[in-house]
Amino acid sequence: VFGCAKKENSTSSSNEETTISDDSSSGSMILSGKLAQGYVRGAKVLADVDGDGIRDSNESQGTSDTSGSYVLNADPGSWMLITSGGTFLDSKGNEVNALPMKAPAPTTSGATSNVTPLTSLVAANPSLKAKLDALGGDGWNADIASSSGVPGKLLRIAQTVEQTMMTLSTGSNAVLTTDSSKLKTLDKLADAFAMQENISSNEALAAATQEGVLNALNDENVVTLSADQKKIKGALVDATLVAVDSVTAAISDTSENVVETSVASTLEAALDNATSVVGTALNL
């Protein structure tokens, strides 16, 4: 599980394990921000130095509060923020398991470092930073769950990533079942988005999703598919495109702000539809 302690061998003391798994942080930089799909509460936030996604004793870790906020101290470096666990509330007030996300290390102390689907793309492919910044608002570091909203261009990209990932990782027919497979799929999506020009357009969102998902499903280092899942790769891609269509229908390609909660119920219904496509294909 990402952000949690590495398993110690049987000779390790329980005190050593507790020390590594408990939240603690130190360093000359103060960083804080929001974990946003909805606002993600109770998630571990790890300043991952060695890139393995598993907390070591020298790595700072915190937990997001009920408003999705976190605070950490860490030393400057090339580490990455990685989240694991946590939940957010859907439009009906039900808790939904959050996706793992990541974000680049900030370069200055005190800077706001949000962790969202957008920052996850940039952490995986830094060339996307300029493309997302060009879309307005706070660009790649936008708080996508803000009650003030964010430019529709940014929100539709964030929601395309989120709905695609949720389609493949929700319910009893989930294809992506580990944080590792989810984060590696995010990497594939980021590389596919980086190849698009007008990345918030309907065409770019569909093309990037199709390519990124196919590349993930075809890479055994990302996910090992069952025999039945291998037979329905096309249907799995189609299901994610159903989710993307719902995003582009609900969120205009606009520079005007759109509030995430205003489209949440529509996207939740569409996600149910997309995951049912996966279930139907597997049961044929």
Where do the model's predicted regions map?
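Feature for extracytoplasmic/surface-facing segments of secreted or surface-associated proteins
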Residues: 4-284
